[in-house]
Amino acid sequence: MAQGRSCVHPQCSTHSRLHWTQINGTRLVFSMNPAPRRAPIILYLHGGPGDACIPLTMRYNAALERDFRFINLDQRGSGLSYHPFAPDEAVTIDSMVEDVRQFVLGLLRGYGQDSLILIGHSWGSVLGLEMVKRYPSLVRCYIGLGQVVSMHAALRLRQNWAQQHLGPRIGSIVSGESGAADIVLMINELLSRGGAAMLFGSMGRIMAYLRSPYYNWPRLLNHAKGVSQSRARLDAELEQVDFSGQTSFGAPVYFISGRYDRHLPGSLVERFADGLKSPHRFIRFERSGHCPQWDEPERFAATVKAICL
């Protein structure tokens, strides 16, 4: 495991540094703050596929470092873990879940703990909920942000909404997983949440990458390549994901959904949560879109602390 330097930009209050580890034949980079050995561990799984976000959690979620060991893992082939996928390299949901499992086991061994807190956002919520399904003993609790429940159902709702409000042409664009769909939905979420003010606010997320001590232009290019290759390998499988038949989990699950989330409508998540027989809770953030952890970071930090401490 190797350390990098901490974020020194004046708008960053993070104490996290970069580390790396070797998992299943690939080098994975992650951020982690110094913390007491017995501090509760949070592992954050980014969205995408491939949309690594260490600069964003450093900028917006550093408040969690006061009470937790907060770790954000750049997944295989993504962000600072970028490498070109080999033609025969296994890049599937199963292989990505196995990467996460091996990473979790290493953390728990290293810090003498039995389980940790998982946070999964969007695509990362697929990996997170699969971890809870398959390995509940490793998960103290799970928090899903922009949770994937049934991609088929989400895409139908997304298309119907877009055709009604934006017209048939836009409806066809957002009916599948693609970069174009993400852009259309993101712009609409921003406008719905307050128009120009929110749009200018979103520039802060772009600046988080441009000002990060860990990103330069070649690494930004690699980030884009990581998104592209991850989508090419995983989007088709992602569109088949369906947790709607699951009625219980072996660890408590919490779902945070933004009122204006056009990517993965909260109505599906709330209905899914209502049908669970195991411990769960659905939480709606009224001022958020698809990224409640960055749209309302103060409320997000307070909510995580209330759930986990």
Protein language model annotation of sequence segments:
Residues S288-P297, A301:
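Catalytic histidine-centered segment of alpha/beta-hydrolase-like enzymes
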Residues R262-L268:
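Conserved alpha/beta-hydrolase "acid-adjacent" motif
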Residues Q163-A251:
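Alpha/beta-hydrolase
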Residues L64-H83:
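Conserved alpha/beta-hydrolase
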Residues G50-N61:
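The serine-hydrolase catalytic nucleophile loop
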Residues V139-G179:
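A catalytic-pocket lid/entrance helix-loop region that shapes and gates access to the active site
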Residues D114-R156:
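Conserved hydrolase catalytic core segment
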Residues S95-S115:
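Conserved acidic catalytic loop of the alpha/beta-hydrolase fold
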